[in-house]
Amino acid sequence: MNNKCIYYVEGPCEQQLIAALKEAPERLIPGKIKVFNVVQNLIPKSQMLSIQAGTTVVLVFDTDVPQTSNLKKNLELLTRYCGKLKIIFLPQVLNLEDKLVRCTDVRTAMELTKSGSVKNFKTDFCKMKTKDCRSMLERHKLDYARLWMTKTPEAYYSWQVESIYDSNFAHEF
């Protein structure tokens, strides 16, 4: 396996979270982040052809839509066009705000960014510099191991993640 990694995340808030967790000291594997909804859209063939065999592909996706056909098709296409990959699933069961509240010492996500509303929180969170975001998460005692530990809805059982640090959670194809 090579040491390349690509993260496919649903939106800018997930992009910010992943980027912050990759800051030193790294809590996630370093790699490139692409904003792309793998549950609702098919990864373009041109992108897949640029992924080298042995790359770790991390799929961060929401589970609020019970339709998983595009996710399954993306997995088929990744294995067809990219050769041997390590694919890691990080399904998000709660919305980002709830997830951060569950994993930090705050009662509301707005406390993290001192925002006046949930909408402002998302805007403020996404606009933060990556290092500032990481510092804010550390200051509020983010428990990294709890981020992706919530049980997924039934439609997503195939992609259940017990722990991001559990060596058995990666699916190799």
Task: Identify the function of each model-found stretch.
Residues 41-43:
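N-terminal polybasic phosphate/anion-binding patch
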Residues 34-35, 39, 59:
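Conserved helicase/translocase motor-coupling segment
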Residues 11, 63:
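Residues immediately flanking
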Residues 6-10:
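Short hydrophobic beta-strand that contains or immediately precedes a catalytic carboxylate
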Residues 2, 15-30, 45-58, 65-173:
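C-terminal accessory helical subdomains adjacent to catalytic cores in phosphodiester-
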